Amino acid sequence: MEETENMKHFTGRELPDNALKASMADGTPYVLPPWRVNDIILLAIETLSDVDYYRDDFDYKKMIREQGIKIKKFSAFSPDNLEKFRKISLSRWEEGICALFPHPVTGEQCRIIAYNENRNSIECMQIVFHEYAHIKLHHTQQSINGEVEATCFALAMTMFLLLEQLFHVGKTVVNAAGKPFLVQTIRNAIKQKEA
């Protein structure tokens, strides 16, 4: 049975095109409901709009660092330390790590994202956004739901940034009608599709 048929068999219905789906370890289908996909897309555009992502000098890593989150390449760690971070990571993905832990002296919450820099720039951005999503979506443990949500968030963030780089969509809309119009137009389009 192909994956689409498995999903139909498991859920008892055809899945909408915008359902994000994955398989759990035992092969049971996992589906992220369309309303949750929509919530995550809105969170992505709101996150980017809050920091004026359409500026020519926008740097996504700087945006994340300004929130007190450290970003490191895998090569910055010794193999032993990298393995320690993997064990406490919220992510189940081998390409990136998202670790939250108390500072040993101050007790303050430390947040770190580490990624495999041996990928092209778009893949690295996708990995960093995936790990950032675990923090942004307040995930507290590894789960298939967390992985699917993080993937959805990372795809939305990457899509908005690529559209901006290629076509200057955000800058054009903001210059013509203002930042609130950009976010509200996307929100309205999602609500209309849900109805």
Residue ranges with predicted function:
Residues M1-A195:
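Active-site hotspot residues in diverse enzymes, especially metal/ion-binding acidic/histidine motifs
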